[in-house]
Structures are given as C-alpha cells and as structure tokens.
C-alpha cells in the first residue's frame, strides 16, 4: 500500500517539475523622467539643502562626484517636492511620513513601467504569469508593492507573490536565485521579477560628521528593472536571452557592519563602516572558484561580467585582483555612468545593456560572444550573490 502511494506521489512530483534550466525570456527597464547631471549636482544639492555655507564639505562632495564615474542619474524627487517637504532636505529631521507617502505610490508605479516593457518583449498574455517577485529597498507597506503591482498590471489574483523589502544592493542576484528555483520547480511557471528603487528614502542634506551618508548622495539613482523567467521555453513564441545555471549566496568573513542601513524617523540612513572594495576584492576569487570549479572554468577573462556597480572603487579593485581586461566591465561601467547606483535594479539594467550591445555589434551570443558569464550582487552583510549564466546564440533572439 505504502509503495503504491509513494509511486503516486513520485509521479505527481515529476509532473510538477520543469525539465530544463531557467531562462531569462525578456528584460524591461524604466526611470523617472527627471534627469540629474553629475557635473551640476554638487551646486544643486548644497543649494537645495540650504548648506552652501559648508564650503569645505561641498568641495569634498564635488570630488566624490567627480570620482564617481557617473555622468547622470534619474531622480523622482524634484526641486518642487523638496521645497514642499523641507524636512527631507535636513540631515536629521523627522520625515519618514513624507518619504513613505511618495515611495509607496511611486515604487510600484515605476515597477509597472519596467514590467510592461518586459511583458511586451515576451509577447505572451500576462495571464500566463504564475509568480511575481517584487524587490525594493525604498519604503515598506501592507499589502505590499507586490500587491499594488498585481493590481496596476491586472495580473491574475491567483498569481503567487513574494515581496522582498530592505535587502539592499545585492538583491538583483537574490531575485534571480529565487526566480530560478521557482521556474525550475514548477512546470509551466512564468516568473515576473521586478526591482524598483527610488532614492527618496535615503536623500538627505550633508553632515560634517557623517561622510558615508554623503557617499550615498553622490552615488544613488532611481530606476526599475523587470525580467520574465521560465524553464522549457516554447521556442515558437518565446526567445531566451540567458540561462541561469547556478546561484549562490554567502556572507563575507570579518565584514560585519561594513554596510548598514537603518529605517528611522529621518528615513533610511546609510552607513559605510569598513573598506568595502577591499573586502569584496579579497573574497571574490573564492566565490568564482566555487561557482565555476564544477564547470572546469578558471580563466576569469573567458567570462562575460555583470557586477553590481556599488561604486567605481569596487570595480577597479575587482579588476585588479582578478587581472580582468578593461573591456570585461564595459556594460557594468556603462550602466554606472548612465544611471548611478540603483541598488537591486543595477544588474538587471546591465543584463539589458549587454544583450542589446551584443546583438548591435553582431556578436555570436547575447553574452558579448562568450558562452559563460557571472552576475554578482554585493550589499549589506557583506552579502555576495553569485549567479552563473550561460548566453544564447544571437540568432535565437531575433
């Protein structure tokens, strides 16, 4: 009797599971319309926060902006908004309500823009979306941004939702890791992943005693990215862009408190307490060996690279430590330059940039002509997400 039941359960189990690896089937991105040029930002920032008397600090901030390798960013908060909400401009004034009122509405809205583009590229009816993962470090609410997006897009009420709040900058890797497991464990699953970030939670005036907060003001930008994932694509209508081969997460040794964020009455405060680029570059080879050893790859220049651009120093030190050729981080640096650090959304923007450039330049695959690639997320913990990707022949994607 028991055997009969076991066989039955086994059969049900097999029917429930997909056969092949998860594929990225579409990517969409969106930003607010308000564009901020980095060259003009120090003047604007010190003027709008009534801090022009802090001339030494402004010089420091100018240097941070010059060294950031960022040309422009997009920000939802405008001068008008800041004039109406002066507490958001102060360094430490109770302003959580004003910030929440904005992000609770705008985070799902920006997410909808990115998701609509991804759904359009995918070309399938949105009723086929079975799972939704929504990720943001910008504001918290109940029911969450996942619920709001379900309503905004008109997804089925039975869509299975996962809401990730307050993960931080590594979460672009986290969402892919979770989406991979969902797609591969559920036959026919189509997972919509949305990362939407709006800096209204972290924006604040300068402080002499907290230069780490100023680093955030020089780097962070707004953006949302969406991807659709599924296993066993229907090649008559779906076009795979990348395959997800494996995904790992680890906490780096001796890195407690290296990056912290705290949600307070003053908004989300950002703290950098240790040498983050040093900690990441020191440990990155271990993550690569663990991920690529089983595949027999040890030449890091043979991979295409998607790394969360926390800041230019992280990219510089990783390149140096691994002996990477300059062009390896091209897509990563391009996104940093054009958008700044958009937290969890960055790596998905970089995936989009890479597949577009690869096709434009007539490369053989979506991964700059290469077969294997790596996607890295870095953030509070220090937490590192490592995703192994395989590209798709360019002919497939047309």
Swiss-Prot record:
GO BP terms: flavonoid biosynthetic process; polyketide biosynthetic process
What does the record give as EC number?
2.3.1.74
Asked if the keyword Transferase belongs to this entry, the reply reads: yes
Its pathway is:
Secondary metabolite biosynthesis; flavonoid biosynthesis
InterPro entries tied to this protein = Chalcone/stilbene_synt_C, Chalcone/stilbene_synt_N, Chalcone/stilbene_synthase_AS, Polyketide_synthase_type-III, Thiolase-like
Return the Pfam families for the record.
Chal_sti_synt_C (PF02797), Chal_sti_synt_N (PF00195)
Top-rank taxon, per record: Eukaryota
Query: Which EC class, in a word?
Result: transferase
Which reaction is the catalytic activity of this chain? (E)-4-coumaroyl-CoA + 3 malonyl-CoA + 3 H(+) = 2',4,4',6'-tetrahydroxychalcone + 3 CO2 + 4 CoA
Give this protein's Gene Ontology molecular function annotations: naringenin-chalcone synthase activity
Catalytic machinery residues: 169
Ordered alphabetically, the record's keywords are: Acyltransferase, Flavonoid biosynthesis, Transferase
**What is the documented function of this protein?**
The primary product of this enzyme is 4,2',4',6'-tetrahydroxychalcone (also termed naringenin-chalcone or chalcone) which can under specific conditions spontaneously isomerize into naringenin.
PANTHER family reported for this sequence? CHALCONE SYNTHASE, HYDROXYMETHYLGLUTARYL-COA SYNTHASE
The family line of this record is:
Belongs to the thiolase-like superfamily. Chalcone/stilbene synthases family.
What's this protein's name? Chalcone synthase
Protein source organism? Petroselinum crispum (Parsley)
């Amino acid at each position: 009797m028991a055997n009969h039941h076991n066989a039955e359960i086994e059969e049900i189990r097999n029917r429930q599971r997909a056969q092949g690896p998860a594929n990225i089937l579409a990517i969409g991105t969106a930003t607010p319309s308000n564009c901020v040029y980095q060259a003009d930002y120090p003047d604007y920032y010190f003027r709008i926060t009534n801090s022009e008397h802090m001339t030494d600090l402004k010089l420091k901030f100018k240097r941070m902006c010059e060294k950031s390798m960022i040309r422009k960013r997009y920000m939802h908060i405008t001068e008008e908004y800041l004039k109406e909400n002066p507490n958001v401009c102060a360094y430490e004034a109770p302003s959580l309500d004003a910030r929440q009122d904005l992000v609770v509405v705008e985070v799902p809205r920006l997410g909808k823009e990115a998701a609509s583009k991804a759904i359009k590229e995918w070309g399938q009816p949105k009723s086929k979306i079975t799972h939704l993962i929504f990720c943001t470090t910008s504001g918290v609410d109940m029911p969450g941004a996942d619920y709001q997006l379900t309503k905004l897009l008109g997804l089925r009420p039975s869509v299975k939702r996962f809401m990730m709040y307050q993960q931080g900058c590594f979460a672009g890797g986290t969402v892919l890791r979770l989406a991979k497991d969902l797609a591969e464990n559920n036959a026919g699953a189509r997972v919509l992943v949305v990362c939407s970030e709006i800096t209204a939670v972290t924006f604040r005036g300068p402080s002499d005693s907290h230069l780490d907060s100023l680093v955030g003001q020089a780097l962070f930008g707004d953006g949302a990215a969406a991807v659709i994932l599924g296993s066993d694509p229907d090649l008559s209508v779906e076009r795979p862009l990348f395959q997800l081969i494996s995904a790992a997460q680890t906490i780096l040794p001796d890195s407690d408190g290296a990056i912290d964020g705290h949600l307070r009455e003053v908004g989300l405060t950002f703290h950098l307490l240790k040498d983050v680029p040093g900690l990441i570059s020191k440990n990155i080879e271990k993550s690569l060996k663990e991920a690529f050893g089983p595949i027999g790859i040890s030449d890091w220049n043979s991979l295409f690279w998607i790394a969360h651009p926390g800041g230019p120093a992280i990219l510089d030190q990783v390149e140096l430590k691994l002996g990477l050729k300059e062009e390896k981080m091209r897509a990563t640096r391009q996104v940093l330059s054009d958008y700044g650090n958009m937290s969890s959304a960055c790596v998905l923007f970089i995936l989009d940039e890479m597949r577009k450039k690869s096709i434009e330049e007539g490369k053989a695959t979506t991964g700059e002509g290469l077969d294997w690639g790596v996607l890295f997320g870095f953030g509070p913990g220090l937490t590192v997400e490592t995703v192994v990707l395989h590209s798709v022949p360019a002919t497939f994607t047309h």
